[in-house]
C-alpha cells in the first residue's frame, strides 16, 4: 500500500482511502466505489443497477430532489463534468470531482452525499417513474452498431454465464414496467458498507477526514441476511470457441483472439511477484505491438491495424487478447496473419534488440512517473484507489515502484520474457469476429477458423533476426543562429525572443509538472491559402507526412530510433493555421527540437507509406454510409458553409482526388518559412539556461527563412443565411430522430465580453434543457449545447443545440428548444442559473491556471489574435449580468440566421 494513502476498514465493513494532495490546490475528489453492478441483477431487474445509479441524483435523505446537483453547482461543481457516476458489469462508482475545500461546510456536504449514496437513497415512486423516460433515451442514444455487436458478442463468447445475460443498460420492457420494489430490493440487498469504499483525495487534512468518515458511518449497519457478494466468472474453453456477429450499420470488421487464464490466487494479488509478472507481460505486449505497427505500414498488409493486451476478462479470469482490423474483403487473410504472428511469438519469442528497446521505454516512462510523483492530479490518485478496491490492483506508491523497476528491470532476461510470451498462447482460444452485413466482406466461417487453429503448429515460420538501429536524427547540424532581441512581456508573463533569422520564440516556465515541456508553433494561413482543387490533398497532407517518417528515417525506423525517448511532435494544417505541436521530457527537449527542425526542412516522400495511408482511409470509409449519422453530420457541414465548393466531405470521392504530389507540395508551401511562425514553449524550460539558448539558436535559429508573411484568406464560407430547415429520413436499426439547431451571427464583434457571454448562454441553456427536456419530458438523454465565438476568417457568434429523441417526441422537443431561447430573451436567465455558471467558469479558470496545456493555449490565443485570458478573463466573467446575457442572445437571434437539420428513421 502506498504510504501516502490512509487506508482502513470500519467494523461494518466500509473501506476507506484518504490522501492529501494539492493538485490542484483547494480542491478534492470524493468517490464512493461500490463492488456491485449489473452482474448481480435478477432477470426481473435487468437494467436496474444502472437505473439505481440515476436515482442517486434524484433524492436522498439529506438532499431532496435535485438537492445534490443544486447545492454543488452553486459552488462551481458541474453536473456531468464533476458530478457523475458510472455502472458497469461488476461495479458502480459515484463521484464529486474538483470540490472546493476552502470552506469546511462544502467538505462536510460532500461527505454527507457519500453517506447518502451509501445507505440513504429516497427512491420515491414519482421520481422512479420520471426517470424511466431518461433511461429509455439513454438506451436509444447508446444503441449504436458497436453496442449491439458487443451485447451479442458477450452472449456468444460466455454462454451460460451471467456475463452473457447482462449488458448494463438492460431490457426496455423491464425499464418501462418494473415494480418499484424490484429496484428497492436490489438496493437494499447489495448497497451496504461491506461492498463499498470511500475515496477522498485532495487538499484536506487526512486525520480530520478519517474522523468524519468514522462518525458518519458509525451507525450504518452491515448488510444482514444477504450473505457475501457472489463472484461470477466465465468458463475456460475445452475447445476453440467461435463467435461471429454482424450488423447492418457496422463501419468495419474486427477480429479478436482471446486466450483465458485463471487469475493469480488472492494470496499473490498486490505482491511484488504479481507486479513483476505484470511488468513482463507489459514488455511482451509492447514488443508484439511494435511488430504489428511495422507490419501495418506495408501497403500489402491484410489489416490496417493490430494490437494486443493482457487484462481481466471477468472476475477471477484474465485473458491475453490479439486484435486485428482487417481491410475489407481480406478478413480471412487478416485472421490467418494474426494467428501467424501469435504463433511466431509463441514459438520463437523476441530478439534481444526488441527487448532492449521496450525496457528502455519502460525505464524512461517510470522515471518520468517518479519525477512527477508530487504533481499528479487528485483524480488520477483517486482512480488508483478505486482499482485497488474493485480489482485488487497493487498500489505500492511511486517511490517503491521506481526503486523496484531500477533494481529488477535490468535482470529481466530474454529467456524469462520469451517463456512468458510462450505461455500466453494455448490451443483453445475464443475467436470473436464482427463486421458489416454486405457483399464483399469475407468473414471466415467457423469451420475455416477451427481448421486454421488446428494447423497453427504446422505453419512455416522463420525466427526473427537481430537488427541494428541508426539513432542519429540529423546527419549535419545547421549553422547556429543568434538571439537578436529578448524582452519580458509582463501582461502575459512570458519571455519573448526574436532570433537572427526572424523566428519569434515565447517562453513561459512553470513547475506544474516536474518533467514536461510543451511546444506549439503556429502561423496564419492554413487551408485558406490552398487552391480549391488541392483541398482534398491538403486536408490529408500532414497525416501523410506523419506516416512517412522524416529525414532519412521511414516511420518504422523513426519509431525505433526514438525508443526510450519521451517525445512527441506532430505537424497540422488546419482551416486557418499551420502548426507543429510537441511535448517532451526535460532530457529529450533537444530531440523535440530536432524533430521540429526536420518537419520544416526534410519532410519525407514515401510512396509506400502513402499507399498504406490511402488504403487505411479507404478501409475506414468503405462502410461510412452504413452509419446514418454520417448523412446527418454531412448535412450539418454543408449547411454551415452554404454548400460552398470548398466544402470537402470526408468520403471515398474525396480520397480519389488526393495525390501524393499535391500533398507534398501543399505541405512544403505551408511550412516553407519558419520565420512566419511563433514558437511557444511552456513547462520545465528556462530561457536563461545557456543550454536552452544554445539548442534554440541551433535548431530554430539555424533554419533558413525569408521575409515573406502570409495571412488568412476569406472565402466567404458562411452559414446558409435566413431560416433554413433540412428534414430527411434514413434507414436505421434504432428508431431515433437526430436534431441539430444552430443560430449564427456575423454582426457581433469579437471581444472577450461577447465570447464569454456566448459561452455562458450555452451553459445556461444546457441547464434549462436538462430540466425541461430530460427531466420534465423524459425526452432525451441530454441536449448538447454550445455557445461560441470564432475569430477567423471574420468574427462569428454561434449557438448550437443537438440531441437524439423518440421521433414521436421530436416536434414537441423542438418547440421547447426555441421556447427556452425566447424565454431568456424576454425575461433574462434565472439568477440561480447565472450565478452557478459564473461560479463554475471562475472555478475552472482557477484550476486551469495550474496546467501547462492551458498556458500553451493562452499564449496561442494571445499571439495569434491578441486575446489576453490572464489579464481579462476573470473581470470579464465577473462583469456578466442577466442584462448582458439577454442582450447578447437577442443580438444573436435577431441576425435571423437559424437552421434545423433533422434526421428521422425511414420507416
Write out the residue ranges for each language-model feature:
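Proteolytic maturation boundary segments
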Residues: 1-18, 205-279, 284-293, 297, ...
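Metal-associated gating/positioning segment near the N- to mid-region
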Residues: 55-63, 67
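Flexible, low-complexity linker/tail segments at the boundary of structured domains
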Residues: 191, 671-672
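Hydrophobic, small-residue-rich alpha-helical packing segments that form membrane-like cores
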Residues: 127-182, 186-194, 199-201, 206-213, ...
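M16 family metallopeptidases and their MPP-like homologs
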Residues: 19, 24-41, 48-49, 66-116, ...
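Active-site His/Glu-centered metal-binding helix of metallohydrolases
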Residues: 48-56, 284, 541
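Peptidyl-prolyl cis-trans isomerase
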Residues: 71, 120-123, 127-128, 412-416, ...
